[in-house]
């Protein structure tokens, strides 16, 4: 269901709407104005669907008073809703005071603005001028972004790389559409299969590209997402460095806060889990730290307190799973304790009372 607008404590503030854009994927058109119902409807209408809604939403009207008798979940023969542009669908009572219009699949168009009319006078005794309740809503325009994780290299297959990530949408998209969007290949035009998995979040899909072979030299894996199969006019490209085989080196380090606060260090090869990392990796600004090795990644966990600067020192003596030393020391400074960016792609709306 879409955003439901609720009645404020004062009639004058009945349907004042604030659209809060959490990320840059809202597509409200400035030449189409939202319909703000009059406060005169306050005694009769408690809530309605409005603002920015999902393409899979239903449209609801919640009355302030229960109807004496309704046939729940049975389609109404006479549809009390009308829309511009026109929408096909069915109408049901879902409770004694809430009526719902269910659009046909695919009827709501991404980015479209709709004006709705609910024939309030069919259910409540009102003045003639209030017999029709007019409202509006917009359908979330589709967009997406790709987020890739650091590469994974295992001790059992040190010459193979796995790339994982997530593709995040502004609205619900079918898995078969996502599968047609993503491709991956190298400069040698080799194509790699991509496994797509639905996550617990309805607008996010995980992807995995495995058995990417290391070559004699570094090369770039190109991941391309074309939105056309999902009706999205957007393309995104991501380049992932695939390190050369037999080349153990430090790749990158990022601040993390999950599962605990710390730093994630990524190497080109799996790190030996038989060595003591104390003295080989240290953060001078913290009094104590805990190390965890996961294949080619080392996690350093610690409490930061009120620190505004961190230094990560990586000693050249660190060895990979084949006992080859790193050979070069590194010192990385984190001047600001910024974590990995958390990107949200949703639009929400809320009702504000009169000031």
Question: What do the predicted segments below correspond to?
Answer:
Residues 9, 20, 46-47:
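Compositionally biased, low-complexity repeat tracts
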Residues 13-24:
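Bacterial N-terminal signal peptides
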Residues 2-15:
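Bacterial N-terminal signal peptides that target proteins for export
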Residues 7, 23, 32-33:
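N-terminal type II signal-anchor transmembrane helix
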Residues 28-355:
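Acidic, low-complexity Ser/Thr/Gly/Pro-rich repeat segments typical of extracellular/periplasmic
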């Amino acid at each position: 269901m879409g955003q439901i607008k609720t009645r404020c404590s004062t009639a004058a503030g009945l349907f004042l709407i604030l659209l809060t854009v959490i990320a840059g994927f809202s597509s409200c058109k400035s030449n189409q104005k939202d319909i703000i119902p009059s406060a005169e409807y306050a005694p009769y209408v408690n809530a309605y669907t409005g603002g920015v809604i999902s393409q899979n939403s239903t449209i609801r009207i919640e009355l302030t008073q229960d109807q004496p008798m309704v046939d729940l979940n049975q389609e109404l023969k006479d549809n009390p809703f009308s829309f511009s542009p026109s929408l096909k669908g069915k109408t049901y009572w879902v409770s004694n005071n809430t009526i719902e219009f269910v659009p046909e699949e695919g009827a709501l168009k991404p980015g479209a603005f709709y004006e709705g009319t609910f024939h309030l006078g069919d259910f409540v005794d009102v003045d003639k001028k209030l017999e029709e309740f007019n409202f509006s809503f917009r359908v979330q325009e589709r967009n997406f972004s790709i987020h890739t994780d650091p590469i994974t290299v295992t001790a059992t297959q040190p010459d193979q790389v796995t790339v994982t990530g997530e593709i995040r949408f502004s609205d619900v998209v079918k898995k078969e559409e996502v599968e047609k969007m993503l491709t991956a290949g190298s400069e040698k035009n080799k194509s790699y299969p991509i496994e797509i998995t639905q996550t617990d979040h309805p607008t996010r899909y995980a992807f995995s590209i495995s058995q990417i072979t290391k070559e004699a030299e570094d090369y770039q894996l190109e991941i391309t997402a074309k939105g056309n199969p999902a009706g999205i006019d957007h393309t995104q490209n991501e380049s992932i460095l695939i390190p050369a085989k037999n080349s153990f080196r430090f790749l990158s380090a990022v601040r993390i806060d999950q599962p605990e606060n710390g730093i994630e260090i990524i190497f080109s090869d799996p790190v030996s889990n038989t060595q003591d990392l104390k003295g080989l990796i240290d953060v001078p600004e913290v009094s104590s730290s805990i190390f965890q090795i996961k294949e080619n990644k080392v996690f350093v966990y610690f409490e930061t307190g009120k620190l505004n600067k961190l230094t990560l020192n990586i000693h050249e003596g660190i060895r990979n799973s084949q006992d080859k030393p790193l050979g070069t020391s590194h010192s990385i400074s984190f001047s600001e304790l910024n974590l990995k960016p958390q990107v949200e792609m949703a639009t929400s709306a809320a009702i504000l009372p009169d000031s």
